């Protein structure tokens, strides 16, 4: 029996698809029902003693559970920083307490971006992102120190399914990519060669399933694209090529190095001259893309035992196009395509993307 938290989320849905083939699944959920016949739901609160359950319920749950996959997390960076920390750190402590009672290993879903600590200036400007990364770093430490077996899982940004492109919820990065397709992003923070490390949800779920089936109960695993991650200019050009299926190729956004964003652009647009909607949008993009600005690629455990095959640039580009196709058919509000969309087989046309020098 696998206890899963976060089953109603993007990754949680993919984990149910993957794990329900071989495991009975009990989903702890708070407000949002999972509504999936393949699982049994238990309403609980990770921030309450004994998960908010009666003593007998808690003890029966502990006696039943054999494996714990803790995927629930506060991921909205617009939330109060204190609430982000409580959800991500205290919720992890609660799962470790249950694991100790159950004698079960914990598979803790962290994030690859713990490897990108923010500078003091960035922490002050983006308190939500800072709280999220700090809480994930602290949660990893309590997993390491816990008296139960623990596996730390570090996915990068989780995108939709690699085959269908579908995703359970609209992610911030999906909105940004959709805005590029619509030609609504004149300026984009980040260096052209920054790696936008994204991994399809089914790839992450397959790796987690492989670790559970393989009996792996310790270690740290990077569920990332690693050195194969698409560069920011490649992501932009793929979006522009996709948009050509619906009409004229949008004007490419200017890519502004992050140091110029902090030193020049953010102070400028935070003045009274610019509309509030423009300030909010650019601030969101700057915060979202902040974590991708690193010199070296992430490590990747994909391709190692139990974790499934490694990803290639071509596979990632194809997955991105399928994600854009699913987005356009759903919430994207795009017209019917004028031709069938095909992933670009070669390198994206980076010459179309212009860099504004610092």
Q: In which residue ranges do the predicted regions lie?
A:
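Conserved Rossmann-fold cofactor-binding substructure of NAD(P)-dependent oxidoreductases
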Residues: 39-65
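Mid/C-terminal beta-alpha module of Rossmann-like enzyme folds, strongest
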Residues: 207-283, 322-330, 334-358
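NAD(P)-dependent short-chain dehydrogenase/reductase
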Residues: 147-152, 156-196, 201
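A hydrophobic C-terminal alpha-helical subdomain
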Residues: 187-188, 258-311
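Short-chain dehydrogenase/reductase
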Residues: 85-89, 128-140, 167-170, 174, ...
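Conserved glycine-rich Rossmann-like NAD(P)H-binding loop of the short-chain dehydrogenase/reductase
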Residues: 23-34, 110
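Conserved Rossmann-fold NAD(P)-dependent oxidoreductase catalytic core, especially the SDR/UDP-sugar
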Residues: 67-71, 78, 82-86, 90-134, ...
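N-terminal Rossmann NAD(P)H-binding glycine-rich loop of SDR-like oxidoreductase domains
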Residues: 1-22
